[in-house]
């Protein structure tokens, strides 16, 4: 199987390569694609050197599967071209997510929707992925009526330049500003551009993607905040169900669901934190407690590595699902 990675030198692209090797993903040929400034350079993958190619070369190399993490403009142009050539595409950009022609997939949640006809498959937003991995088993059991989500997101979600801004400010170095304000020792309630309704685009991604993947009947509202941590996204989530619940049953549902690790022992100071989620493919959940202010309501704290499960790992898991279920061709 000929595998192409488009955007192979970026934060997510490098992470995809790492996850592929860790999970022993089976390919016969690896084609690494990056921007013109990187073409001709080499990357070492599993002790083997690979020369970085231009995206145009894919027309000749004809990959069977292409993993895109090079931004919306590249995906908009090249994903349909490759799909017409018979190549399956898994795309990390936002350009196809709300397009009804394409499926938005989290394998633990809706992987079973995939068929051989799906040539372009969209990877959800990082904050949506970790949220819905946790909400899915609870919605099946208790039917979520409303979700209030507040996120606390690492600058790594904005790319390498944003991480550099954080590190430069921490060291007192003047450098390029990705954000309109300093991020070090600050919290920015502003992720992506503001919309006419007063929400940011990031906040609306959480709302719209939850409706597309899980259930359009769930009332969702979100506030997304950028915080000065070098990796990991956190979410404070308040849920209201149509059915009542017992906390022990909630713990049981979450503990027995794939991709979830429950860390919930406040007496021993055990709860999810981004510093401990780094490098993990799991979604961590804790601070699980009944909301005493509203009937049938629950509070949760969800943490995950946004570059792993929030991007690279979910992409690779979709690819694994295609292979395991003979959907690739």
Label each PLM-derived region with a short phrase.
Residues 1-183, 219, 283-284, 288-294, ...:
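N-terminal Rossmann-like NAD(P) cofactor-binding subdomain of oxidoreductases
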Residues 66, 155-329:
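Charged docking surfaces used in two-component/phosphorelay signaling
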């Amino acid at each position: 199987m000929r595998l192409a990675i488009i955007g192979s030198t970026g934060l997510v692209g490098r992470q995809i390569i790492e996850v592929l090797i860790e999970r022993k993903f089976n390919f016969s040929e690896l084609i690494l694609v990056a921007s013109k400034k990187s073409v001709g350079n080499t990357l070492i993958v599993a002790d083997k050197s690979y020369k970085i190619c231009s995206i145009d070369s894919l027309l000749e190399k004809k990959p069977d599967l292409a993993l895109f993490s090079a931004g919306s403009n590249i995906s908009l142009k090249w994903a349909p071209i490759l799909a017409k050539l018979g190549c399956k595409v898994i795309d990390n950009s936002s350009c196809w997510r709300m397009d009804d022609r394409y499926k938005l997939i989290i394998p633990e949640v809706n992987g079973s929707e995939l068929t051989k006809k799906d040539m372009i498959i969209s990877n959800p937003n990082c904050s949506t992925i970790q949220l819905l991995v946790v909400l899915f088993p609870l919605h099946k059991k208790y039917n979520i009526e409303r979700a209030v989500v507040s996120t606390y997101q690492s600058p790594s979600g904005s790319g390498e330049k944003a991480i550099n801004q954080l590190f430069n400010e921490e060291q007192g170095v003047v450098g390029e500003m990705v954000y309109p304000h300093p991020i070090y020792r600050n919290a920015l309630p502003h992720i992506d551009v503001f919309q006419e309704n007063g929400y940011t685009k990031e906040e609306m991604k959480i709302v719209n993607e939850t409706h597309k993947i899980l259930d359009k009947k769930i009332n969702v509202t979100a506030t997304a905040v950028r915080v000065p941590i070098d990796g990991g996204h956190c979410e404070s989530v308040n849920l209201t169900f149509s059915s009542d619940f017992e906390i022990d049953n909630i713990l049981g549902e979450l503990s027995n669901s794939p991709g979830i690790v429950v860390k919930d022992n406040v007496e021993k100071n055990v709860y999810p934190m981004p510093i401990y989620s780094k490098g993990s493919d799991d979604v961590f959940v804790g601070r699980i407690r009944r909301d005493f202010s509203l009937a049938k309501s629950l509070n949760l704290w969800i943490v995950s590595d946004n570059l792993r499960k929030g991007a690279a790992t979910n992409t690779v898991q979709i690819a694994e699902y295609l292979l395991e279920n003979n959907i690739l061709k």
